[in-house]
C-alpha cells in the first residue's frame, strides 16, 4: 500500500521540529491517553513513532510493568528515538523500523495501539487502521490523534501569517496529505469495522508570551527543502531566522492570539 511522501526529509531539522511540536501537543495527548484509559502494565504499539514523543508519553502511562513498541519507516528516526529514550532513562521502550501498513501479529497481541499525526499521510488510512486494530486483543484500546489544518491559525490576518499558511497548505495539497484527517476519524473508524469511537477536540491557544508561533514557523522551516524543490517558496522568502519574530510581531501589534493545530482524539475498544 502506498504512503504519501512525508513533507520533510532533513533529519536534524525534523528532529528539532518534532521535539518542539511535542512541547505544544504532548499535554493534549497526555489528556487524551488519560481519558481513553491507557494504564499501567499495558503493552502498547505506537504507530509512526518518529523521534518518540508519543512513545515516551505512553511509556509513562504503562510504567515499568508495561511495554511500548514504536514503529517508524525511517531508520534514522528509529535510531534517534532510541537514543532520546535511553537518555531519558526509559527501560520499557523499544523502537523498530517498519511500515504502519505492513504490520503483522508475529509478536503477539497488544493491549493498545496509539498514534499521532500518522494517518493523514497514508494513502489508505482505513486499511492501515484495520490492520493496526488487528494487532490489539479483544477488549483492547485503539486511540489516535489527528489534526485539522484548515482552520484559522491566528486571529491576526497579517501578511506573514497569510503567506505562511499559503506555503504550508500548498505543500500539503501537492503531497495529497489529508489536512482534515482529524474530523474524518469517526468515519475512518466506522469504515475500518471498529465500534463508534469516543471523540474529543483540543487545541493549544495563547497570546503574548504564550503565543505558539514558533510551532508554525518550525513547520515551514522543516518543509523548506521540499517547498524549494516544488517551487512553492525559496529560502530567502521564508527567511527562517526571522520568521517566528515576524509572526509574533504581527500578533503582538493587535493583541492577537495564535491557535495551534486542532487535534481530534478518537478511541474505542476492539470487539
Regions found by a protein language model. Give the residues of each.
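C-terminal helical/coil "lid" or tail adjacent to the Rossmann-like core of SAM-dependent
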Residues: 4-7, 13-14, 25, 196-258
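Conserved alpha-helix/loop element of class I SAM-dependent methyltransferases that forms part
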Residues: 23-42, 57
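Class I SAM-dependent methyltransferase SAM/SAH-binding core
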Residues: 45, 51-103
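A short acidic, Gly/Pro-enriched loop at the edge of an enzyme's catalytic core
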Residues: 104-112
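A short SAM/SAH-binding and catalytic strip from SAM-dependent methyltransferases
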Residues: 111-125
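A short glycine-rich, Lys/Arg-flanked "PGG" loop and its adjoining helix->strand segment in the class I
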Residues: 126-141
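Conserved catalytic/acceptor-binding region of the Class I
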Residues: 143-210
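Core SAM-dependent methyltransferase catalytic element
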Residues: 192-195, 263-271
Amino acid at each position: 500500500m502506498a504512503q504519501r511522501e512525508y513533507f520533510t526529509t532533513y533529519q536534524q531539522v525534523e528532529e528539532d521540529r518534532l521535539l518542539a511540536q511535542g512541547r505544544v501537543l504532548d499535554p493534549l495527548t497526555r489528556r487524551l491517553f488519560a481519558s481513553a484509559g491507557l494504564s499501567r502494565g499495558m503493552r502498547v504499539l505506537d504507530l509512526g513513532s518518529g523521534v518518540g514523543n508519543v512513545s515516551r508519553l505512553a511509556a509513562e502511562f504503562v510504567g515499568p510493568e508495561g511495554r511500548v513498541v514504536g514503529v517508524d519507516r525511517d531508520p534514522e528516526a528509529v535510531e534517534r528515538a532510541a537514543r532520546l529514550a535511553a537518555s531519558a532513562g526509559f527501560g520499557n521502550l523499544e523502537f523498530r523500523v517498519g511500515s504502519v501498513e505492513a504490520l503483522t501479529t508475529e509478536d503477539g497481541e497488544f493491549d493498545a495501539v496509539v498514534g499521532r499525526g500518522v494517518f493523514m499521510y497514508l494513502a489508505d488510512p482505513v486499511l492501515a487502521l484495520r490492520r493496526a486494530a488487528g494487532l490489539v486483543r479483544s477488549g483492547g484500546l485503539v486511540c489516535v490523534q489527528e489534526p485539522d489544518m484548515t482552520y484559522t491559525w491566528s486571529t491576526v490576518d497579517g501578511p506573514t501569517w497569510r503567506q505562511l499558511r499559503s506555503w504550508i497548505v500548498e505543500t500539503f495539497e501537492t503531497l495529497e496529505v489529508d489536512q482534515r484527517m482529524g474530523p474524518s476519524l469517526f468515519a475512518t473508524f466506522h469504515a475500518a469495522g471498529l465500534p463508534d469511537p469516543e471523540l474529543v477536540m483540543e487545541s493549544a491557544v495563547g497570546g503574548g508570551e504564550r503565543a505558539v508561533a514558533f510551532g508554525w514557523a518550525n513547520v515551514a522551516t522543516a518543509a523548506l527543502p521540499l517547498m524549494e524543490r516544488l517551487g512553492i517558496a525559496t529560502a530567502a522568502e521564508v527567511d527562517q531566522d526571522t520568521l517566528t519574530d515576524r509572526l509574533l510581531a504581527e500578533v503582538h501589534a493587535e493583541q492577537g492570539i495564535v491557535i495551534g493545530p486542532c487535534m481530534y482524539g478518537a478511541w474505542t475498544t476492539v470487539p
